[in-house]
Amino acid sequence: MTSLPASLRDPAWNGRIATCIVAIVILWPMLTMAEFKPWILFDAQSLQATWQFLASFFPPAHSLEFLEMVAYSTWETIAMATAGMTLALLGAIPMTLIATERLSISRLGTGRIARWAMALRQLVRWLLILLRSVPELVWALLLVRIVGLGPTAGVIAIALTYCGMLGKVYADILESSDPAACDSLLRNGSGRLSAFLYGALPASASELVSYTVYRWECAIRGSVVMGFVGAGGLGQRMDESMKMLAGDELATMLLVFILLVACADGVSAMLRRRLE
């Protein structure tokens, strides 16, 4: 077997092979520790349980009383996600103004940021890290113990986690925007808020709104998941139906959930198109 001439050999071939070997060496112990055994899904007992579970879905529950309850829970889920996002925005916007170096007034004179401003900025950044490092499901689990069952825990949980996420990403977007307009306003005596509204925001509005809408879509999905720990909404009703082994009710709520996410995705796509 003749070897390829040097001019036809892929110079990155050895690197790709080495990368694959390293990835396998790292990934295999993780899969072993996670007890990843997908073949269990295909043994006789699992297949029988799967068939029985799916068979209980048909026909989906469609009584008027049940559909009214599902409609109310769906609206509660949307309200929970929207209220949580609104509170998150109220916290994220002022923290973004502090955390963004692009909006610093003290750096314009000497090129250095004042120590007190740097300390405050680092404090806010650490607060954003703290908020987003705890998933909303964990916040909901903790808050249910404090405020009790219901959507209040879900609203606060979304507000806390998404405040950290929005503040971090907003600051990154503003830092990567064109600094010319913002710097010009600050040098001519403009305040931080005015520089943000008339300098940084117009250049980054499309990206900021696009990410905000995406997070609202994520908040709707998260609201359903938080219902499983007692935070109300469609998820709590799904949890109750699963405990009662009511597959027909679960099927209806799954269909509603899929339609809800599809509608949220449609609204998100429409807003993005209007911003382009």
How does the language model describe each region?
Residues 81, 85-93, 97, 137, ...:
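Hydrophobic positions within alpha-helical transmembrane segments of bacterial inner-membrane proteins
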Residues 93, 97-101, 169-176, 180, ...:
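Membrane-spanning helices that line or support transport/gating and their immediate boundary helices
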Residues 145, 221-257, 276:
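Glycine-rich helix-loop "coupling/hinge" segments at transmembrane-helix boundaries
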Residues 210, 251-276:
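C-terminal transmembrane helix and the adjacent membrane-cytosol boundary/short C-terminal tail
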